[in-house]
Amino acid sequence: MSLPHSLFLVIFGASGDLTRRKLMPALIKIHNGKRFPEHFAIIGCARTAYTDETYRAYLKEELIKFGFLTKEEMETLDDFLSTVHYQSMDPADETTYFLLNDRLKELSPQYENNGNYLFYLATPHLLYELIPKCLHDAGLLKKPGLKRIIVEKPFGYDLASAQKLNKIYAAYFKEEDIYRIDHFLGKETVQNIMVTRFGSTIYEPIWNRNYIDYVEITAVENMGIGTRGGYYDGAGVLRDMVQNHLMQLLAITAMEPPAKFDKNGFRNEVIKVYQSLRPLTDKYIRDNVIRGQYIAGDDRIGYREEKNVRPDSRTDTYVAMCLYVDNWRWQGVPFYIRTGKQMPTKVTEIVVHFKPAPMQMFQMKEGFYKGEELIIRIQPDEGILQRIAMKEPGAGFYMGTMEMDFSYDQHDQETGDAYVRLLEDSLVGDPTLFTRSDAVDESWTYFDKILDYWKKHPETPLYGYPAGTWGPKEADVLINRSHSEWTNPCKNLTHSNLYCKL
């Protein structure tokens, strides 16, 4: 795979928060690394009435004001912005796409572009159905030239809507040209899970039911919903986080080694994990899925006091559940996943708990030995920590634990932004780390059963938990069934902006 000679990156939603905070800072890094095509331009599209000059001035002010740039990026900012153009249009108005087509034709001679377009949908998801058809009807998908499209989550609201979207996109794009982006897969530590698993003779032989007791996957935030009340109250955290982000982390943790690490080999193994999940029955959902909603705690308001949230809302802001991957490698090993808003800290990590030795001849001075752990910290402070058994210094043979850790920050290694990696992959046409349509269908097929159960059984408990705590106590009961407890990086009601030690 290689860069095309020329390419236009067309961003819908160019005046929005995602473009300002994530896309433009990532694109500057790619520009400075000289990893753009030889002839490359960015065309921002939104309703705001900018010109090329005023849009560049807006971006420059925003990027400087919010401190997104390094010293080197500040020095090259004007050079980068010279590749940025703007077309005022309404993505919801199909007639304005002809204006975009005319603009791209106008710019094509300057950039030697023969119709190579990469479209990025940084828009509200309600426009996802409309935009592909409008692109087609305005002649923007005509040959010659490559045509690719990047779509942010959520890709669908449920199985039916996801299948409808897949059908719409398949009518206008090849599957290999549809890039359903999940920024978790662009994170260095997530990709490193596969290297640790399949490239290490220490972990590869023991990564199975014979040596692993249980696995935790946590992805929580210390903020509420902010200004997203209108969207979030109709979605909830199961749709917003579990169906996509946590499922990807589960798949990478549990997948078999692909026969070949390419766009199909990797994603085929992801699908196999989804298909191996223990089927959900009503009883299983009752016993193994906990949902919650944050209430006022300390100095934080409750969910129902948030802007644009119904005062009697039953929307989930916390979900914990126990899953099983029913295959040869993982039979009987519980995977505990949880995600929530208004937690004590922001952290995403995977904790692999290994089984204790079959006979313990050494005692702990205090407490009991829980077994060794491998902690994979995805954000913040990306790194890996291994807790292993070690003799306590002094007389006797008392057992304790020692921590061996690696942090990218401590070794001055730049992990890079997830959007940098994923944008680079889309530029060269590598969809390996993007979600395939069949994975979307499999994931929604699984979680639709939980959503349907909640809809049919409105009496299903929605447990309140004070903002700033680790969620409802019922989630602790869920994991305590395996004589276990959640791995919490810090205590309840920690309101510091500082991240917790790995």
Positions of predicted regions on the chain:
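Secretory/organelle targeting and membrane-embedding segments
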Residues: 1-151, 155-502
